[in-house]
Amino acid sequence: MKLHIYILILFSIFSFIVPMTVMATEEPKYELIEKSGKLELRQYQPMLIAEVLVDGNMDQASGIGFRLIADYIFGNNITKAGNSQKIKMTAPVTIEPRSEEISMTIPISLKKNSGRWQVSFAMPRKYTLDTIPLPNNKQIMLRKIPARKVAILEFSGFVNEKNTASRAQELLKWMDKKNLISTGSIELSRYDPPWTLPFLRRNEISVGYAKNKAKEF
């Protein structure tokens, strides 16, 4: 009985701390244009990202890409003063396919056993390309993304290639009903540390969008 109560107390504390930790993490700024349940249209401000290209399937690429960029932000870098500097962790961690074989048609498949993936972190807003420390690992690239409009589907739970493709399909169908077309690759973003309980996790499928002018006539 005591053990049961102890577990419940730990669970309650953990459930409280994890969301608070995520809330304290800096995220890219955006304006909410429209919301329908878990589906949203957003206008993102320009942002600076650190990215790396990784070969393999989605799970392999996510792990390798995360470790490479984490190594950079934890101090494997050089400033203009010649020293290293830790960069504050941000959310989310994003992965997207970089294979010409993946199209934006329905049904969509993100299963690429020998594909190439881009894994990226958004950098803290205080940095610019001129002020951010440079990575010592030449695999890591720094890039500024311009302001853009993005369609989003938020979901919780574990992430795998099958449910990611299913969510992407759901998002594209919703966009089609709203007379919107995709303008880039499907992206998967994860906001939480790996120890977060599945039902507390925040994941997002996203893609840039524009009006489908062909259907307006």
Please give the residue ranges for each predicted region:
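A solvent-exposed interaction/effector surface
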Residues: 2-217
